[in-house]
Amino acid sequence: MAEQINESHQRFLQVLMSHGIMESSLVRALHRHCCEVHKVNYMHDNLDDFVGVLNKHLQPLFMKIEKGVGEEDGLTYYALVNRVENDITKMASDYAENELELFRKTMELIIISENGFAPPISILNLADELQSKKMKKKEVEQLLQSFVQDKWLIGRNGEYTLHTRCIMELEHYILNTYQDVAKICNVCHKIAIQCQLCENCGIPLHLQCAGIYFRGIANPLCPNCKESWPHEIPDLSQVSSQGPSHSQAAPVRGRNQRSRNISTVARTSR
């Protein structure tokens, strides 16, 4: 029989859900806070067990708290992921049909791009290609801000890429839908959106994976074809010292169906 969840688990889950995704240091602090507030025995190395108890109760709802690595900062993140819906219909409670269609097209632009980014002008032009209700340019601009706020996209230097949360939640959809063009990192074997490509054989490496793999090597060679690696090796110390961006830390808009599911977990576990 699964261990019962208590008020500390419920508070932890509600906060994680309100943020959508949280960096691991914040999750560890949240774990401690929840245990202390509800006077539950706290052990700093017990986070995995704490999350494991929650995941056992989330399993019947086809939801899970998972860990992933941010492509931009290499930090570990925790997110509440819906495992039964393998496409972007999981976003349907927050967006209209034409908005979801625009997101699909935007995601495709990002995935097929060489650097993992889509310029805003290309996304704005998608408004004229929608099969459902057309959108005005101003509406597209406002929608992009909503995608950023809800942590599906990240805006960086005027362009857009997929948020860590989006990659974690839509991993299966991306692999199934874009299996011929989706890039898989040669080192960690995870989806690679922002990456470096070998100019000879075309294999991709996450920026973080490239930094780790080539660390201390004066003349880096492609791990696949052994040709000279043509790119500047990322400085991991500079990236990691930046910490998570504000968009990674801010809460997202509420999700009604997911909120009801969480309430069900809390009630049935008492």
From Swiss-Prot:
GO terms for cellular component: chromosome, telomeric region; nucleus; Smc5-Smc6 complex. Signal peptide: none annotated. A zinc finger (RING-type) spans 185-226. It catalyses: S-ubiquitinyl-[E2 ubiquitin-conjugating enzyme]-L-cysteine + [acceptor protein]-L-lysine = [E2 ubiquitin-conjugating enzyme]-L-cysteine + N(6)-ubiquitinyl-[acceptor protein]-L-lysine. Its EC number is 2.3.2.27. Belongs to the NSE1 family. This is Non-structural maintenance of chromosomes element 1 homolog. It comes from Xenopus tropicalis (Western clawed frog). The lineage of its organism: Eukaryota, Metazoa, Chordata, Craniata, Vertebrata.
